[in-house]
Every structure is written in structure tokens, then in C-alpha cells.
A protein has these predicted regions:
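Short alpha-helical scaffolding segments that buttress acidic/His motifs in well-ordered protein cores
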Residues: 23-27, 301-305, 350-358
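Structural helix-boundary/capping segments
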Residues: 33, 100, 151-156, 162-258, ...
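Short glycine/serine-rich loop/turn segments
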Residues: 58-200, 251-253, 311, 396-414
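Conserved acidic residues
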Residues: 39, 155, 392-394
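Conserved hydrophobic/aromatic pocket- or pore-lining residues that grip, position, or stack substrates
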Residues: 27, 66, 98, 126, ...
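Short, surface-exposed loop/helix-turn segments at secondary-structure junctions
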Residues: 81, 227, 305, 332, ...
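Short, well-ordered alpha-helical
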Residues: 1-87, 91-92, 114-116, 228-241, ...
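General small-molecule cofactor/ligand-binding pocket signal
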Residues: 106, 287-294, 436
Length: 485
């Protein structure tokens, strides 16, 4: 039963075919099964129950929460040894909003440490494996959430997206990953990584469920001054597939196979299928055009992201000292205790990011690196803002193919000719744009994804376009096969 969508589960609850306890118990059982095979969780809440009486469509529905959201009375580690025993005394606003609807949190999902990674291999609990092929990654940082939704543990899970941390894992795991407009959902209680980029979002197995969940998560919050009043936006109520006349663009340089030296067969197939999807969109009544963007601007995207995100992370995580929370470090004085705590607690990947962040924020380097990165970010955002005046959205393939093998993962910063194709989703974080990934097919029996990004506050348009394409392709509600074999 639990592998159904939200509407179907609500109907079963409403007509008395099942109880909330039935769904929760089944979800917990599936979670343990998945944990034994794919290592998707930090905590499974075996005594989870519904204490709320609500007429919400989400009442009684189990869900998962990425472990960088604060959850009252439940371990919240950020998948880091620095917070391995941290139990918050409050809920993140997004979690609180779902609890008010009567939804039941049954698990905290594993992630790349503090959300700083794109592989799902740096959690303090170990590598999170892809439910479609346990030799492959889920992507990151929201690996556990993507994995568990794909495996059918529950119909939705929370993620967070700073560069592509919802949308890339969604593609690799064959589910929907939705990052709303920046500020639609409160970040209060979300462990800060890069505050100008961080966005709360959701994984589901269809676009409709994504609309339902974000309707419940969103809202203005006096504890997060970046939130805005979205009360007049009813994503689920206004969801439709009427896309005739909509205009989309894609970045020509990134989807032209001739621009890649020695392209793999997988990349060739991925781009070939993307161009077929463009024809599908045109046959649906949409106008889709290629747009050329200055290569210098495109090539700058990964570097700008690294510079800004590392700088903000270095500042945000300066409070992780081992003195206020987390395991106490050893030392004869405060400085030695802090040094011991941070040296032992953070992984090498996190330390590298802090080194970069500290370097670009040094007084003598700020102008050359950090401030210039902020200026280039503005140029990129302005370019896309101008395009969104003419077009309803940008349509692009996600990444360069299927999920990589765990054995081939390299957690260092790389530079190759697919680098921008792998990282173009970061544009949505630069501008706070709404962006959604949906399953678009399979290559070698592994899922790949399609992304739609639109202008700020145009979430309804983005969801409607994704919904229409989803209805046409019919890759929704797919459960990952063979994860327990």
C-alpha cells in the first residue's frame, strides 16, 4: 500500500480501508529493509505515530526528513561526526508545518556531510547506495531522501538544494525533485550551508504530490526574513496540463554533442533522447528554441558556485566549536579544544571547502575572488532574467547521463568539458529560480532526468509544464527495482 501516491493513500484512509498505523508500520518495515541494502537513513523512528487530527490530505501519511533539518527530540546530525549526538529541542518550520497537517515523520535520511557534496558518499554513516543499482551513487547531497522515495518507503521526503542537491539525486533515482522559489519555504531549522543559495524542497514520485507537499510546507515565517507571502499561490489546486503556446528555451552549447571531445556513448544517448523530448514538447503545442549563451559566462558557473558556497559555509559553520553542542574536544584550553573537535569531526572534503572559503574571504583576496564571484553571479542571473521575459522556462537534461559507479566517484573539484552540463542546475540557486526535475526515461535500464526552470514566483508555470510533460512521458510513480536483491 505504501508505494501508492498521496491521493491514493488519502482515499484509502478516508474510506477506512487502512489506518494510519497500518501505513506507518509498513513504511517503517520498508525503511529497515532499505537500510539493510542501501544505507539510506541516519534514524528510523520505530515508535512514530500520528497524534494530530486534521482534515488535511496529508493527515496520516508517512514521510522522511533529510537529517539537516532540526527535529524536536529526534537525532539531527547533518550526517557529520561533529553533531553525531545532537538532539534539537525544536522543529524546523517546514517540519512543524507538516506535523500540523498530521503527516507522520518516520525517518531521518542520510546526506553528504552538511549538504556539502554531490555524491552521497561522505555521510558519517557511510555510502548511500542507489536502489536501482547498489554499485552506483544516488547523487547528493540529499541522497537518502531520493533513495527512500525511489524505493517506495513513503510517498515523499524533504530535501535541501544549494546547488542541485535535490534535482540531481532525483534524476539519478528516477523520482521528482522540486526546488521552489527561494523564500517560499522557511529555512528556519535547516542547518545553514550557503544561506543565499540554500532552498528547502521535496522528493516525490509525481508532480502532483510535489505540489501537495510544498503547499503544506510553504508560508511566510517571522523566524526567516527571506520568506515571502505565498498564500495566494495554490499549487495543487491550480495544477493543470494546459501548455499550448508556452515557450521554452534550452542552452544550445550544452546539448550539442559536437561541443564535447571524446563523448561517451552514454552522453551521446542522453543528448539524443533530450532532442527527441524537444520534439515531444513541440507536438504538445509548446514552442521550444535553442538559445546561445556566452561560453565564458557558462564556464564560470562551477567556479562561481564553489567560491560563494565555500565562503558562506565557512562563515555559517564557525559556530561548530564543540563548546555549545557536539562532542567536546580534548585540550588544555578553549582554542585547543576547538581545534581538536574540528580536526577530528570534519571530513577532508569539508575541511577543503573551509580552506577555500577562508582564502577567498581574506582581506587581500576578497576583491579578486569572492566579490568578483558575486558580480559574475549577478551577470548570470541577469542573463536568465532577460530570457525569462521572453520564455516561460528553460528545459535541459540533468547531468551527462546515469548515476556514476561508486568506484568511480571523485569528491575533488574537477574541470572537464562536461563540467558545465553537470553543474548548470546551479543557475537556479544563483537566481532563486523555481526548478524541478522529473524522470524522462532510461539508459541501460537506469533512470535519467529532465529539468524545467522558470522565473522567480512562477512556480505554478514550472509545475504545470512539468506535469504536462510527465503525463505525456508517463514515467511517474515508478518504484526502483532490485534494491533488495
Amino acid at each position: 500500500m505504501i508505494k501508492n501516491g498521496i491521493i491514493e493513500l488519502h482515499e484509502l484512509l478516508y474510506n477506512g480501508s487502512v489506518t494510519c498505523s497500518d501505513l506507518v508500520n509498513e513504511s517503517i518495515k520498508e525503511a529497515h529493509n532499505l537500510q539493510n541494502n542501501c544505507n539510506a537513513f541516519v534514524t528510523i523512528i520505530d515508535d512514530a505515530k500520528n497524534d494530530c487530527k486534521s482534515d488535511s490530505i496529508l493527515c496520516g501519511i508517512p514521510f522522511g526528513v533529510k537529517d539537516n533539518y532540526s527535529t524536536k527530540g529526534v537525532l539531527s546530525t547533518g550526517s557529520s561526526n561533529t553533531l553525531k549526538d545532537y538532539v534539537p529541542f525544536f522543529d524546523a518550520t517546514a517540519v512543524e508545518n507538516l506535523k500540523k497537517c498530521g503527516a507522520v515523520m518516520v525517518a531521518k535520511t542520510a546526506l553528504d556531510e552538511f549538504g556539502m557534496g554531490g555524491t552521497g558518499t561522505t555521510a558519517h554513516t557511510g555510502v548511500i547506495k542507489n536502489p536501482w543499482d547498489k554499485n552506483r551513487i544516488c547523487g547528493g547531497s540529499s541522497a537518502g531522501s531520493a533513495c527512500s522515495v525511489a524505493a517506495g518507503v513513503y510517498p515523499f521526503a524533504f530535501g535541501s538544494d544549494t546547488g542541485d542537491s535535490i534535482r540531481k539525486p532525483a534524476a539519478y533515482c528516477g523520482v521528482v525533485g522540486y526546488k521552489p522559489t527561494y523564500g517560499m519555504i522557511s529555512r528556519y531549522g535547516l542547518f545553514a550551508f550557503a544561506s543565499s543559495l540554500d532552498t528547502c524542497g521535496v522528493f516525490t514520485r509525481n508532480v502532483r504530490d510535489a505540489a501537495i507537499v510544498v503547499d503544506a510546507m510553504k508560508g511566510i515565517d517571522d523566524k526567516d526574513q527571506t520568506t515571502w507571502d505565498s498564500s495566494d499561490i495554490k499549487l495543487y489546486e491550480n495544477l493543470n496540463n494546459k501548455v499550448d503556446g508556452k515557450k521554452l528555451f534550452y542552452i544550445s552549447e550544452l546539448v550539442d554533442i559536437n561541443n564535447y571531445s571524446n563523448p561517451s556513448d552514454e552522453l551521446k544517448k542522453h543528448l539524443e533522447e533530450f532532442h527527441k523530448l524537444i520534439l515531444v514538447c513541440k507536438n504538445m503545442g509548446m514552442k521550444v528554441e535553442g538559445v546561445s549563451i556566452d561560453k565564458t559566462l557558462l564556464d564560470a558557473i562551477p567556479s562561481v558556485y564553489v567560491c560563494i558556497s565555500c565562503a558562506e559555509a565557512t562563515s555559517n559553520m564557525s559556530n561548530l566549536t564543540g563548546l555549545i553542542f557536539g562532542p567536546r574536544g580534548n585540550g588544555v584550553n578553549v582554542v585547543d579544544m576547538m581545534k581538536d573537535y574540528r580536526t577530528k569531526g570534519f571530513s577532508p572534503l569539508i575541511k577543503r571547502r573551509f580552506v577555500i572559503g577562508s582564502y577567498v574571504l581574506q582581506k587581500e583576496n576578497q576583491e579578486r575572488y569572492y566579490l568578483n564571484a558575486c558580480r559574475v553571479r549577478r551577470l548570470i542571473v541577469d542573463k536568465f532574467k532577460s530570457l525569462f521575459k521572453e520564455y516561460d522556462g528553460c528545459i535541459m537534461p540533468v547531468g551527462s547521463g546515469v548515476a556514476p559507479l561508486i568506484s568511480e566517484v571523485n569528491n575533488t573539484i574537477t574541470d572537464n568539458d562536461v563540467n558545465v552540463l553537470e553543474n548548470h542546475l546551479q543557475i537556479a540557486n544563483f537566481g532563486g529560480f523555481p526548478s524541478i526535475t522529473i524522470p524522462s526515461g532510461f539508459i541501460n535500464n537506469l533512470p535519467v532526468g529532465l529539468n524545467i526552470t522558470g522565473d522567480c514566483y512562477k512556480d505554478q508555470d514550472v509545475l504545470n509544464i512539468a506535469y504536462a510533460i510527465e503525463e505525456k512521458l508517463n514515467y511517474k510513480n515508478v518504484i526502483a527495482r532490485d534494491y533488495n536483491e
